[in-house]
A protein has these predicted regions:
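Anion-binding (especially nucleotide phosphate/pyrophosphate-binding) glycine-rich loop
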Residues: 2-156
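Phosphate/pyrophosphate- and phosphate-bearing ligand-binding catalytic cores of soluble enzymes
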Residues: 13, 19-25, 159-314, 318, ...
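Residue-level signal for inorganic ion chemistry
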Residues: 37, 61, 125, 157, ...
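Generic non-transmembrane alpha-helix signal with a bias for helix starts/N-cap capping motifs
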Residues: 41, 102, 276, 320-321
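Short amphipathic alpha-helices in soluble, non-transmembrane regions
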Residues: 44-48, 206, 319-323
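A common structural junction motif
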Residues: 50-54, 324-331
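Generic structural marker for isolated residues within well-ordered, non-membrane alpha-helices
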Residues: 106, 279, 324
Length: 346
């Protein structure tokens, strides 16, 4: 088993995590270590096993809520590197380390003529979090391009490769949030992109802005950035984790009942007997959009975004629970929280 002695001097005690979560919550890690290589990760996992410490991997911190101080060993996954294969049949395979910034990578792809990810521009966070929730926006999801995920098994401390089928992707979910929760630490992601200028512009908000325009990948990229900046606050300026709730999926029967009462409610038909609803609309029509609740609140331009004004994790979760309760009472729809909660059963 990998020697863990070298890692000890790199581990910090009672480490402030405020700068490592985009909600800027002032929680502390009992122990903390920044991970720059797979071998260092293996050493840290061995050390955690020897000391009987629970491990908590984080990266960009853009999809988590720290409800309290985090016990055990927090691993900041900071692996870097992007490599591309030779182009074959108008496609290119790209391997990306888990610590690479997502938007910077999308920009790199655009500049290199690797296409497909333009709709996912400006999504906050790092590469390692992308497959966990199968990030998506404006009609495109990561799973459309993912070939495999490089991981280290927490129990065996050995590297493994999970195929796209192994990842069991769904709407904002994957095996990493379900049966393999806490089983792996993601170290890299392998994608296949097109070297031909393909675009995806069927999403209504995108289609409206591009009406009468011949969309190029650059135009789609710029338009998506424009849309996101117009609706979503920059976490560096107003701490947030982006969309706090998933868009709920209901039966067609329930959707029809809602439509009869609320003819203006946005709906998106899905395969089978299901319909996706706009969580932001439900929250806004419960009166939460732009509201402030002590040191936290709901953004004035996007009701899906909860923002932090120097509050703590419990403040955020109390607001989220209030929103869930009001939406359930008014619409009989259950909202599901998108970010992962640490230090609290929710």
């Amino acid at each position: 088993m990998t020697d863990s002695l070298a890692i000890i001097e790199q581990i910090h005690k009672s480490f402030d995590l405020k700068d490592f979560n985009s909600l800027a919550i002032p929680a502390k890690a009992e122990f903390f270590c920044s991970i720059d290589s797979v071998s260092q990760l293996q050493q840290a996992l061995v050390y955690a096993k020897q000391q009987n410490l629970k491990i908590t991997p984080i990266s960009g911190g853009s999809n988590l809520v720290l409800a309290a101080d985090v016990s055990g060993l927090v691993l900041h996954i900071n692996l870097k590197g992007v490599s591309a294969s030779t182009v074959v049949d108008n496609t290119v395979d790209i391997s990306v380390a888990a610590g690479e910034n997502w938007h910077d990578f999308v920009t790199l792809c655009l500049n290199n003529g690797w296409h497909g990810l333009e709709n996912l521009a400006l999504i906050p966070g790092n590469m390692g979090a992308a497959p966990i929730q199968n990030i998506g926006a404006y009609g495109v999801e990561l799973s459309h391009f993912l070939q495999s995920v490089d991981v280290v098994n927490v129990e065996t401390v050995q590297p493994e490769v999970l195929t796209d089928e192994d990842c069991d992707f769904g709407y904002r979910t994957s095996v990493f949030k379900q049966s393999a929760l806490d089983k792996y630490v993601i170290t890299g992601v392998n994608l296949r992109l097109s070297t031909q200028p393909v675009t995806h512009v069927s999403y209504p908000a995108l289609a409206d802005l591009l009406q009468g325009v011949e969309p190029t990948p650059k135009i789609v990229f710029d338009t998506v950035c424009q849309l996101r900046r117009s609706k979503l606050p920059d976490p560096k300026e107003i701490p947030n984790v982006g969309s706090f709730f998933k868009n709920p999926i209901v039966s067609k029967q329930q959707a029809d009942q809602l439509m009869a009462t609320y003819p203006e409610i946005p709906m998106f038909p899905l395969k089978g007997d299901f319909t996706k609803l706009a969580a932001a609309w439900l929250i806004e029509h419960c009166g939460f959009k732009g509201s402030r609740h002590g040191k936290v609140g709901v953004h004035h331009k996007q009701a899906l975004v909860l923002v932090n004004f120097e509050g703590n994790g419990e403040d955020i979760l109390l607001l989220a629970e209030n929103i869930k309760t009001q939406v359930a009472e008014k619409f009989a729809v259950v909202l599901e929280v998108e970010p992962r909660i640490y230090g609290h059963t929710y």
